[in-house]
Curated annotation (Swiss-Prot):
It is found in: Cell membrane. This is Phosphate import ATP-binding protein PstB 2. The lineage of its organism: Bacteria, Bacillati, Bacillota, Bacilli, Bacillales. The gene is pstB2. GO terms for biological process: phosphate ion transmembrane transport. It catalyses: phosphate(out) + ATP + H2O = ADP + 2 phosphate(in) + H(+). Its main location: membrane. SUPFAM superfamilies: P-loop containing nucleoside triphosphate hydrolases. CDD domains: ABC_PstB_phosphate_transporter. Its EC number is 7.3.2.1. GO terms for molecular function: ATP binding; ATP hydrolysis activity; ATPase-coupled phosphate ion transmembrane transporter activity. GO terms for cellular component: plasma membrane. Belongs to the ABC transporter superfamily. Phosphate importer (TC 3.A.1.7) family. ATP binds at G57, P58, S59, G60, C61, G62, K63, S64.
Length: 271
């Protein structure tokens, strides 16, 4: 548990109000239920384009449930239902008639534990492309290379593309999962504790990668690590008991929180 606020090793400047920037996604009055359990309670959040937004809060506060709601992954859970709007490109995607396959192509996700397919490194990245109808081998190879480069993995695997993805280290597997997601050319990347199972060196590589990827993608990351949130994010939202307590620029939230619950959490007084 932290006993002091995360250090912000940059010159503090006022972060623009997220509502003043072009939005990649937003939720309006979003509720998520697991049976009778009201897990997310009327959350309104806006995610600016090409920025990193961190979702923080104690275990069980609802941040991962909220993240999974953004590309409708909660639909796969029996007894889960959602109310309210999930806006992507200004369209509410929380509707039955929405094509979830296309939603998850546009809004990619990387999970806490690396989950490569039991296929070759090449096939892990190419698989989704083929499923979406790409047939030209040259085009597929170009997209595979481009995606592996964006995930900072190409130089490490370019001579071993035929090897099993399971032969890679944990950090390499997670970057492969990121490459697999970006190969589909999403606009938004959802990262659920992407470095929590990795060693410090691999974690540093993932964080460097996040800073690179935001030039092309909007990134929303769940993390228990407040130091990590301070390092990689532009905006931070503090969740508690299924509600957003505070949402602001990361520097402002960690150095001048406006809510006592936020202050207590980042100071290590609860959570």
């Amino acid at each position: 548990m932290l006993t002091k606020k995360p250090e912000i090793n940059t010159i503090l400047q006022a972060t623009p109000d997220p509502h003043s920037l072009p939005a990649a996604m937003a939720t309006e009055d979003l509720h998520v239920y697991y049976g009778d359990n009201h897990a997310i309670k009327g959350v309104d959040l806006t995610f600016p384009e090409n920025k990193v937004t961190a979702l923080i809060g104690p275990s069980g506060c609802g941040k991962s449930t909220y993240l999974r709601a953004l590309n409708r992954m909660n639909d796969e859970i029996d007894g889960c239902r959602m109310e309210g709007q999930i806006l992507y490109d200004g369209i509410n995607i929380n509707r039955k008639e929405v094509d979830l396959y296309n939603v998850r192509k546009e809004i990619g996700m990387v999970f806490q534990k690396p989950n490569p397919f039991t296929k070759s490194i090449y096939e892990n990245v190419a698989f989704g492309l083929k499923r979406h109808g790409m047939k030209n081998k040259k085009e597929i190879m170009e997209r595979v290379e481009k995606s592996l480069r964006r995930a900072a993995l190409w130089d490490e695997v370019k001579d071993d593309l035929g090897k099993s993805a399971l032969s890679l280290s944990g950090g390499q597997q997670q970057r492969l999962c990121i490459a697999r997601a970006v190969a589909m050319q999403p606009k938004v990347l959802l990262l659920d504790e992407p470095a929590s199972a990795l060693d410090p060196i691999s974690t540093s590589k993932i964080e460097d990668l996040i800073n690179e990827l935001k030039n092309k993608y909007t990134i929303i990351i769940v993390t228990h690590n407040m130091q990590q949130a301070a390092r990689v994010s532009d905006y931070t939202s503090f969740f508690y008991l299924g509600e957003v307590v505070e949402f602001s620029g990361t520097s402002e939230l960690f150095t001048n929180p406006q809510q006592k619950q936020t202050e207590d959490y980042i100071s290590g007084n609860f959570g």
